[in-house]
Swiss-Prot record:
Component of the tRNA-splicing ligase complex required to facilitate the enzymatic turnover of catalytic subunit RTCB. Together with ddx1, acts by facilitating the guanylylation of RTCB, a key intermediate step in tRNA ligation. GO terms for molecular function: metal ion binding. The keyword tRNA processing applies. This is Protein archease. Component of the tRNA-splicing ligase complex. It comes from the Eukaryota. InterPro entries: Archease (IPR002804), Archease_dom (IPR023572), Archease_dom_sf (IPR036820). Pfam families: Archease. It comes from Ictalurus punctatus. The keyword DNA repair does not apply. Keywords: Calcium, Metal-binding, tRNA processing.
Length: 162
């Protein structure tokens, strides 16, 4: 399943047409009772960005989101895996418990591989069922089968609980 097809209203289609298409470097892999996100990028920072967008893309069609507001996130971990976990969990918190914020784009501003800290920014808006199609709720991020391949073309595999 390369892209989730959601039934879009004419208003949602109009918003999508207003902005350039999002360059998606992620896919969804089948996993028992959960969903595995697979993201990649030219850099590890881009793979992190794409992993966050894959998570949001499972909840709604991010191309219907307008870049009206910005939110910055700072996360930290004990290693790269825990950093990825907290990065995704902090973004999920902004959606589910805090501001109901859904980004159109997430950009990593700084990734410190020695201190395991990351700063990122998202451009988007408050999730609104009248405006954004409802996908599947993401309940939590898991450490299960998490992989970060930091090679020439970095890849990330992360499982989300739905």
């Amino acid at each position: 399943m390369n892209d989730r097809e959601l039934d879009l209203t004419e208003a949602q289609k109009a918003i999508k047409a207003k902005y350039p298409a999002i360059n998606k470097k992620y896919e969804y892999l089948d996993h028992t009772a959960d969903v595995q996100l697979h993201s990649w990028g030219d850099t590890l920072e881009e793979a992190f960005e794409q992993c966050a967008m894959a998570m949001f893309g499972y909840m709604t069609d991010t191309e219907t989101v307008e870049p009206i507001d910005t939110i910055e996130i700072e996360s930290e971990g004990d290693d790269l895996e825990s950093l990825l976990f907290h990065f995704l969990d902090d973004w999920l918190f902004k959606f589910s418990a805090d501001a109901f914020f859904v980004p159109r784009e997430v950009k990593v501003l700084q990734l410190d591989r020695m201190r395991f800290t990351i700063r990122s920014i998202g451009w988007g808006e408050e999730f609104n069922l009248a405006k954004h199609p409802q996908g599947t709720e993401v309940k939590a991020i898991t450490y299960s089968a998490m992989q970060i391949c930091d090679k020439e073309k970095p890849e990330i595999f992360a499982i989300i609980d739905i």
